């Protein structure tokens, strides 16, 4: 692995983050052969925000106007991709405030909230409410893990006011939650 001068590393770091704003400090440290702390110091010197803030910025710029059914800041997790009436993806980092103190396992309502708010966000109407949800928790999620929720809208049925949204949440490639959300939707008058 090539060793870069501080100036070269910082220039390449800036380019790497511009190309992929979702890259983690750990991935950058590995890429440049330095410590995570060095990457963090470089980011601070370059006024580049941490991953969480970069994700929020990308989501607010790209999706704030797209999501009609609820304000973007009410979505649990950060939306990283959305195609209204089709699909959506969000990420949620499990931190200490989301887990049971004794065993560091995430409280189920956080996983449910991420999936439910994503199912709501993918509906293109101003009013979208969950009428029924069937959720299966496949495995526990631990503090420090990242949950990636993927919502997929099923083709329309006879009842146009109800849309079914399937949500699957993963940690890495491992399924942790599977849900079916029946969403009532209408344009507010």
UniProtKB/Swiss-Prot annotation:
Keywords: DNA-binding, Fatty acid biosynthesis, Fatty acid metabolism, Lipid biosynthesis, Lipid metabolism, Repressor, Transcription, Transcription regulation. GO terms for biological process: fatty acid biosynthetic process; negative regulation of DNA-templated transcription; negative regulation of fatty acid biosynthetic process. GO terms for molecular function: DNA binding; DNA-binding transcription factor activity. InterPro entries: HotDog_dom_sf, Transcription_factor_FapR, WH-like_DNA-bd_sf. The keyword Protein biosynthesis does not apply. Gene3D superfamilies: Hotdog Thioesterase, Winged helix-like DNA-binding domain superfamily/Winged helix DNA-binding domain. CDD domains: hot_dog. It comes from the Bacteria. The keyword Chaperone does not apply. Transcriptional factor involved in regulation of membrane lipid biosynthesis by repressing genes involved in fatty acid and phospholipid metabolism. Belongs to the FapR family. HAMAP family: Transcrip_fact_FapR (MF_01814). This is Transcription factor FapR. It comes from Listeria welshimeri serovar 6b (strain ATCC 35897 / DSM 20650 / CCUG 15529 / CIP 8149 / NCTC 11857 / SLCC 5334 / V8).
